[in-house]
């Protein structure tokens, strides 16, 4: 509703303003000076709410208290936002069973925390000629994570690496 660089009291340059009282009642069109006097008598501030209106709309309110309330609301909104991190699990085309299970456990732990997981395979030397081996490893990995994750991007090559993106399943599904 009101921006951070809000015009208050003497900062308002319009000659006439439509005045709204502190209870939300319309006080009519007043000169800027008269509106400032009314706000001053109530020990409150005159705040420009709608600058583009004809005439501009001003409201009588305690600006300090209003800013405090706005900051509190913004802080609460930021606190409720879930930050999703991207975790990477590196595999190799010739990964052993125990190593695969360890990487899988870590990936499942990340997914249960709500993070996305990027499973990547780096091909070294001539291993790049056998991309199907890496493809099978990533397919096996995505099938093993199927209970807690959905595949966001299918396995694809990027230079000498092949990667797969997994996102946590929603509770709704």
From Swiss-Prot:
It comes from the Bacteria. Keywords: Cytoplasm, Initiation factor, Protein biosynthesis. One of its GO terms (biological process) is ribosome disassembly. It is found in: Cytoplasm. The keyword Secreted does not apply. Pfam families: IF3_C, IF3_N. GO terms for molecular function: ribosome binding; translation initiation factor activity. SUPFAM superfamilies: Translation initiation factor IF3, C-terminal domain (SSF55200), Translation initiation factor IF3, N-terminal domain (SSF54364). GO terms for cellular component: cytosol. Its main location: cytoplasm. Belongs to the IF-3 family. Monomer. IF-3 binds to the 30S ribosomal subunit and shifts the equilibrium between 70S ribosomes and their 50S and 30S subunits in favor of the free subunits, thus enhancing the availability of 30S subunits on which protein synthesis initiation begins. PANTHER family: TRANSLATION INITIATION FACTOR IF-3 (PTHR10938), TRANSLATION INITIATION FACTOR IF-3, MITOCHONDRIAL (PTHR10938:SF0). This is Translation initiation factor IF-3. The lineage of its organism: Bacteria, Bacillati, Bacillota, Bacilli, Bacillales.
């Amino acid at each position: 509703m009101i921006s951070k660089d809000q015009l208050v009291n003497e900062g308002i340059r319009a000659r006439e303003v439509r005045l709204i009282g502190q209870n939300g009642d319309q006080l009519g069109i007043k000169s800027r000076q008269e509106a400032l006097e009314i706000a001053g008598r109530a020990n409150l501030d005159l705040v420009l709410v709608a600058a583009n209106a004809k005439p501009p709309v001003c409201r009588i309110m305690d600006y300090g208290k209003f800013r405090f309330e706005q900051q509190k609301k913004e802080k609460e909104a930021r606190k409720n936002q879930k930050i999703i991190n991207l975790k990477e699990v590196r595999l190799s085309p010739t990964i052993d069973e125990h190593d695969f299970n360890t990487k899988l456990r870590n990936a499942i732990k990340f997914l249960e925390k709500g993070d996305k997981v990027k499973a990547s395979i780096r091909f070294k030397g001539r291993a790049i000629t056998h991309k199907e081996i890496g493809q099978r490893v990533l397919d096996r990995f995505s099938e093993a994570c199927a209970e807690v994750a959905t595949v966001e991007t299918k396995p694809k090559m990027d230079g000498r690496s092949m990667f797969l993106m997994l996102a946590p399943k929603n509770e709704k599904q």
